C-alpha cells in the first residue's frame, strides 16, 4: 500500500541520526522527511499542490472538480452528427427494428449493467486496445472495485500524470515536467547503507548497467533484478534455466556480484514474483535507468500479494461452504447464472488484474522521467517498506538532449510501440526471417538513426526493434527523403521523425568497430539489430552509424548465443566443420560467459577534430552547390576512417596499431578493436 504519511519514516530516520554521524546521511534523511511529510502524487511521487496550474504536482481538489466527465474528441464528433439525424434515421442507425429482446430481458440486462463497475474512459485509454479493455474491465463486479477503492483509497494523482497516462497527452515534455537525473543525484538522496535493488533492462543489456553504482555500494551489497525476460524467453522455465545462468554469470565475472544476488523476471507476466517478494529486503530502494520497469515490478509485487491473500481467503473452509451453498441456491432456483467454467474464471482473473494494475501502485509510462520523486510503498502483509525511485540516464549527452528526441517523435502511439519491444526468440534467432543489405545501402528505423553499409559488402539483418526498418539505395537518398517527406506521402509511415538541415547537422557520426562473425547493434531502451556478414569479404571499410544527440548505442556479441542453444561449429566428436555442414552435422550447445573476451564494445566516435569530414557533410555540401561528391573526397573519407580505427586500436591494446585494406580480421584478433 502506498503511504503519504511520514511518521514511520520519521521514527526510523531519527534512530539512524543518533546512531550515525554522517553529513551525507543527514542530507538523505532530510530529503526523505520532506518527501514523506507532504502528500505526493501516487503515480510519480511529486509533492502535490493545488495553487499553480502550471507548476509541478498540480492537482484539482475534489470539491472543485467539474461534474462533466471527459469525452473523447471522436465521441464529440460522433454525437454532433447523430444529434442532427431524424428519429427514423437514428433507429435505422442502431438497427432498433431488428432487436428481438423482450421487455423483461431488457429490464434484466439494465439491472445487470447498473451493477457493473463504472470505469472512467480516461482509465480505459491507458490500456492499449481501448474497446476491448473497456468491455472487459466493466465486467468486473462492483464488489471487487469497491474493495480496491476501500483498500487503496489514497490514489491521488497530479494533472500531468492523469493526462499522460489516461489521455496520452504529452504536450509539455520538458525537464520540468519529466525530469531526468544522473546516478550521482539519485544516490545522494538515498541514505547510506540502505539496501539497493538495481533493476536491469534485458531489452538493451548491458547498457542499463551503470558501473558507477559500485562506487556507492560493494558488489556483495547490491542486488540485481533483470526485467523484461519475456522479450528473450518464451517461457518461465527457459528464463530460469538459461536466463538465470547467463545474467548471473555476467554480473559475477564482470563485477563480482554473487550469483544469489541476481534474479531474472518478467514484470508484465509476474514470472517468479513469489520469490521476488522474499528477494527484496525491507527498506530497499529500487533504482535503475529510465524505462527499465521499476514501477512495473512494484505493481507486480503488490498484485502478487493481493492474489496470495485472495487465494488464502478462497481456501478458507467457511468461505468454501458459503460459496457452495450459494451455488446450490442458484441451481435450485433455476437461475440464468451458471457456474463459471475454467475459461470464464481465467477471464475473470484477467479482468481483475487489469483493474488492479490501473488502480494500485505507482504510475507506469513509456515516457522517460515519468517518476519524479521517491514513492514509499508499504507491503503491509510482508511487513516491508520499499521505495520507487526516479530513473536516471548514464551520460550528460542524454541528460541534455533526451527531451529533444521525444519531442520530435510524431505520435505518443509510436513511443509506446518502440518501447514495447519484440520477442527476440521469434525475431532474432538463426531461424528467424532476415533481409539482406547490399553495399552502399543505408538503413533507418523511422529516421531515428542511419546505418550505412560499405561498398562491395553484404549483410543479413534481423530486426529486434518494434518498428519496421527501411533500406535506401544510398545514404544521399535517405537524407533527401527524410528531410522532404511532404514530397513523398507514401514514405510517411516509414518515418516517425522528420528531419531538416538543422537536425541533420546535429547527427553524430560513429564507426562500428571491425568485427568477425555476427554482432548485435544495440540501441538503448529500444532493442537491437542482428548483423551478420555474408558472402566473400572484399573490403575492410567499416559500417557507419549516424545517431542524434541523446541516443546511445553499442555493439555486442549476439545475446542469443548465451540465452539459447546455438550451433557450435563442431560435430559430435568436437571436430570443426565447414560452413556448409554446420546446419546438418553441427551440435547445439549453450555458450557460457566467462569474461575471457569482451562481450560488448562502445562505438568509435568519428567527429573528433575540426578537419574531420563525413558523408553527411559532403551530401549537404553537394545539395547546396549542386555539384556531385567526387571520388577523391570519398577516398579521403575512407583513409580518415582507417586512421581513426588505428588510433582506437592503439588505445585498446596499448601498442601502436595500423588499420587498412590489407588488415586481416579473423577469429584470432577479432576483439583487438573492441573496447568496453
From Swiss-Prot:
The keyword Mitochondrion applies. Keywords: Mitochondrion, Transit peptide. GO terms for cellular component: mitochondrion. Residues 180-395 form the CP-type G domain. It is found in: Mitochondrion. Residues 1-48 form a transit peptide. Residues 98-117 are annotated as: Disordered. Residues 98-110 have a biased composition (Basic and acidic residues). Gene3D superfamilies: P-loop containing nucleotide triphosphate hydrolases. One of its GO terms (molecular function) is GTP binding. This is Genetic interactor of prohibitins 3, mitochondrial. It comes from Scheffersomyces stipitis (strain ATCC 58785 / CBS 6054 / NBRC 10063 / NRRL Y-11545) (Yeast). The gene is GEP3.
Amino acid at each position: 500500500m502506498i503511504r503519504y504519511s511520514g511518521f514511520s519514516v520519521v521514527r526510523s530516520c531519527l534512530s539512524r541520526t543518533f546512531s550515525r554521524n554522517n553529513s551525507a546521511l543527514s542530507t538523505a534523511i532530510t530529503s526523505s522527511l520532506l518527501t514523506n511529510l507532504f502528500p505526493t502524487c501516487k503515480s510519480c511521487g511529486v509533492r502535490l499542490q493545488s495553487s499553480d496550474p502550471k507548476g509541478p504536482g498540480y492537482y484539482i481538489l475534489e470539491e472543485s472538480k467539474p461534474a462533466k466527465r471527459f469525452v473523447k474528441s471522436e465521441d464529440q464528433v460522433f454525437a454532433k452528427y447523430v444529434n442532427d439525424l431524424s428519429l427514423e434515421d437514428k433507429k435505422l442507425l442502431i438497427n432498433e427494428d431488428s432487436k428481438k429482446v423482450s421487455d423483461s430481458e431488457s429490464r434484466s440486462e439494465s439491472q445487470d449493467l447498473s451493477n457493473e463497475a463504472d470505469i472512467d474512459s480516461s482509465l480505459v485509454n491507458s490500456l492499449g486496445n481501448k474497446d476491448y479493455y473497456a468491455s472487459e474491465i466493466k465486467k468486473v463486479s462492483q464488489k471487487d472495485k469497491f474493495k480496491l477503492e476501500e483498500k487503496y483509497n489514497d490514489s491521488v494523482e497530479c494533472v500531468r500524470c492523469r493526462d499522460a497516462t489516461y489521455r496520452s497527452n504529452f504536450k509539455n515534455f520538458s525537464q520540468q515536467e519529466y525530469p531526468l537525473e544522473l546516478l550521482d543525484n539519485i544516490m545522494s538522496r538515498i541514505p547510506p547503507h540502505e539496501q539497493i535493488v538495481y533493476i536491469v533492462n534485458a531489452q538493451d543489456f548491458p547498457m542499463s548497467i551503470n558501473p558507477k553504482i559500485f562506487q556507492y555500494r560493494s558488489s556483495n551489497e547490491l542486488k540485481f533484478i533483470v526485467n523484461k525476460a519475456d522479450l528473450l524467453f518464451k517461457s518461465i522455465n527457459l528464463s530460469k534455466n538459461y536466463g538465470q545462468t547467463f545474467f548471473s554469470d555476467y554480473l559475477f565475472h564482470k563485477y563480482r556480484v554473487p550469483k544469489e544476488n541476481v534474479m531474472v523476471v518478467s514484470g508484465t507476466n509476474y514470472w517468479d514474483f513469489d520469490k521476488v517478494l522474499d528477494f527484496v529486503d525491507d527498506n530497499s530502494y529500487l533504482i535503475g535507468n529510465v524505462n527499465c520497469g521499476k514501477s512495473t515490478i512494484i505493481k507486480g509485487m503488490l498484485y502478487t500479494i493481493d492474489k496470495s491473500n485472495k487465494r488464502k481467503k478462497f481456501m478458507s473452509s467457511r468461505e468454501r461452504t458459503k460459496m457452495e451453498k450459494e451455488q446450490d441456491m442458484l441451481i435450485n432456483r433455476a437461475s440464468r447464472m451458471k457456474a463459471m467454467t475454467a475459461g470464464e474464471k481465467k477471464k475473470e482473473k484477467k479482468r481483475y488484474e487489469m483493474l488492479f494494475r490501473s488502480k494500485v501502485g505507482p504510475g507506469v509510462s513509456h515516457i522517460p522521467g515519468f517518476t519524479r520523486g521517491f514513492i514509499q510503498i508499504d507491503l503491509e502483509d510482508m511487513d516491508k517498506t520499499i521505495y520507487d525511485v526516479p530513473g536516471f540516464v548514464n551520460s550528460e549527452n542524454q541528460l541534455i538532449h533526451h527531451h529533444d528526441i521525444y519531442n520530435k517523435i510524431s505520435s505518443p502511439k509510436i513511443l509506446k510501440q518502440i518501447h514495447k519491444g519484440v520477442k527476440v526468440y521469434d525475431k532474432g534467432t538463426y531461424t528467424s526471417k532476415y533481409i539482406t543489405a547490399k553495399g552502399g545501402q543505408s538503413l533507418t528505423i523511422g529516421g531515428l538513426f542511419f546505418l550505412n553499409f560499405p561498398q562491395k559488402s553484404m549483410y543479413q539483418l534481423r530486426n529486434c526493434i518494434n518498428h519496421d526498418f527501411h533500406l535506401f539505395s544510398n545514404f544521399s537518398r535517405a537524407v533527401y527523403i527524410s528531410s522532404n517527406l511532404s514530397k513523398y506521402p507514401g514514405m510517411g509511415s516509414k518515418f516517425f521523425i522528420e528531419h531538416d538541415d538543422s537536425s541533420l547537422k546535429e547527427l553524430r557520426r560513429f564507426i562500428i568497430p571491425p568485427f568477425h562473425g555476427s554482432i548485435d547493434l544495440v540501441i538503448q531502451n529500444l532493442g537491437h539489430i542482428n548483423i551478420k556478414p555474408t558472402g566473400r569479404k572484399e573490403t575492410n571499410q567499416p559500417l557507419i552509424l549516424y545517431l542524434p544527440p541523446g541516443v546511445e548505442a553499442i555493439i555486442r556479441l549476439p545475446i542469443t548465443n548465451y540465452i539459447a542453444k546455438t550451433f557450435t561449429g563442431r560435430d559430435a566428436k568436437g571436430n570443426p566443420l565447414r560452413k556448409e555442414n554446420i546446419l546438418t552435422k553441427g551440435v547445439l550447445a549453450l555458450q557460457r560467459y566467462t569474461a575471457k573476451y569482451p562481450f560488448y564494445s562502445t562505438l568509435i566516435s568519428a567527429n573528433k577534430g575540426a578537419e574531420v569530414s563525413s558523408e553527411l557533410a559532403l551530401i549537404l555540401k553537394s545539395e547546396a552547390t549542386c555539384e556531385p561528391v567526387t571520388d577523391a573526397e570519398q577516398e579521403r573519407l575512407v583513409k580518415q576512417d582507417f586512421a581513426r580505427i588505428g588510433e582506437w586500436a592503439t588505445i585498446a591494446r596499448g601498442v601502436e596499431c595500423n588499420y587498412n585494406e590489407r588488415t586481416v580480421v579473423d577469429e584470432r584478433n577479432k576483439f583487438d578493436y573492441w573496447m568496453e
